[in-house]
Amino acid sequence: MIIPMRCFTCGRPLAQYWEEFRSRVEGGEDPRKVLDELGVKRYCCRKTLLAHVPAIYEVRKFKRVL
């Protein structure tokens, strides 16, 4: 839902890469090349960034029920 702060598997901090990764991929660059240039080498970290879906915009449309 929110940006991944750390890799779910190894715990490496990833939040500092998210904005640049997202903007470059939305600009049409190859995600593989972007991750290589950012220095994200571990496959678990790459998976965490590639698989993230920013669903917070969809979820916040719903009314909060307690």
From Swiss-Prot:
It is found in: Cytoplasm. InterPro entries: RNA_pol_su_RPB10, RNA_pol_suN_Zn-BS, RPABC5/Rpb10. The keyword Cytoplasm applies. Keywords: Cytoplasm, DNA-directed RNA polymerase, Metal-binding, Nucleotidyltransferase, Transcription, Transferase, Zinc. Its cofactor is Zn(2+). GO terms for molecular function: DNA binding; DNA-directed RNA polymerase activity; zinc ion binding. Its EC number is 2.7.7.6. Transmembrane segments: none annotated. GO terms for biological process: DNA-templated transcription. Binds 1 zinc ion. Belongs to the archaeal Rpo10/eukaryotic RPB10 RNA polymerase subunit family. Part of the RNA polymerase complex. DNA-dependent RNA polymerase (RNAP) catalyzes the transcription of DNA into RNA using the four ribonucleoside triphosphates as substrates. This is DNA-directed RNA polymerase subunit Rpo10. The gene is rpo10.
